[in-house]
Amino acid sequence: MACGATLKRTLDFDPLLSPASPKRRRCAPLSAPASAAASPAAATAAAAASAAAASPQKYLRMEPSPFGDVSSRLTTEQILYNIKQEYKRMQKRRHLEASFQQTDPGCSSDSQPHAFLISGPASPGTSSATSSPLKKEQPLFTLRQVGMICERLLKEREEKVREEYEEILNTKLAEQYDAFVKFTHDQIMRRYGEQPASYVS
């Protein structure tokens, strides 16, 4: 009978022959509910930790800058064309102001000869000293030099705007990141803060 009982042992007696202790197996069901109850908190805490590990710079690296694909909007030819058009408008404005000063009866006597010299042609008897002062002035820069100056100013302005945009974007992302971390922490404390801490094996 003893041999038959020995041969008819079920699998329940196998842990006795295994190197693992049976106490460890009996404690496993008791710790399972605690670990299951703490699993949502652990998952939320892990999500918060992973979110806290990220920084606004990570989002900036993931999302390309909106200035990356923007090429130069104004070419050198367009800048030169705009300068020519602006120069023509300035000349027309000066002629209009000169004609208004010439036809205005309330203008002073010393401004009338100046207006005449600007708008009207010089009389044959006048000397070269009484010619228009605009004809005496020599241009300091050529048209190409003015275009290069304008192009450089536009590039400097574009870089300044880009730096200001990146700075504002970093500030806004940092504020959103802090608000998200605070919101996640408040949610964790509100949901699991009142529960007693349990040992998780």
Curated annotation (Swiss-Prot):
Highly expressed in testis, cerebrum and cerebellum, and barely detectable in liver, heart, spleen and muscle. Also highly expressed in various tumor cells from hepatoma, glioblastoma and pheochromocytoma. Changing S119A: Abolishes binding to YWHAB. Loss of transcriptional repressor activity. Reduces transcriptional repressor activity. The keyword ATP-binding does not apply. Polyubiquitinated. Polyubiquitination is dependent of UBR5 that extends pre-ubiquitinated AKIRIN2. Keywords: Adaptive immunity, Cytoplasm, Developmental protein, Immunity, Innate immunity, Membrane, Nucleus, Phosphoprotein, Protein transport, Repressor, Transcription, Transcription regulation, Transport, Ubl conjugation. The keyword tRNA-binding does not apply. Changing T103A: Abolishes binding to YWHAB. Loss of transcriptional repressor activity. GO terms for molecular function: enzyme binding; identical protein binding; protein-macromolecule adaptor activity; transcription coregulator activity. A motif (SYVS motif) lies at residues 198-201. The modification Phosphoserine is found at S18, S21, S55. GO terms for biological process: adaptive immune response; cerebral cortex development; defense response to bacterium; embryo development ending in birth or egg hatching; innate immune response; negative regulation of DNA-templated transcription; negative regulation of gene expression; negative regulation of transcription by RNA polymerase II. A motif (Nuclear localization signal) lies at residues 22-27. It is found in: Nucleus; Cytoplasm; Membrane. One of its GO terms (cellular component) is membrane. PANTHER family: AKIRIN-2, AKIRIN-RELATED. Belongs to the akirin family. Homodimer. Interacts with IPO9; the interaction is direct. Associates with 20S and 26S proteasomes. Interacts with SMARCD1; promoting SWI/SNF complex recruitment. Interacts with NFKBIZ. Interacts with YWHAB. Molecular adapter that acts as a bridge between a variety of multiprotein complexes, and which is involved in embryonic development, immunity, myogenesis and brain development. Plays a key role in nuclear protein degradation by promoting import of proteasomes into the nucleus: directly binds to fully assembled 20S proteasomes at one end and to nuclear import receptor IPO9 at the other end, bridging them together and mediating the import of pre-assembled proteasome complexes through the nuclear pore. This is Akirin-2. It comes from Rattus norvegicus. The lineage of its organism: Eukaryota, Metazoa, Chordata, Craniata, Vertebrata. The gene is Akirin2.
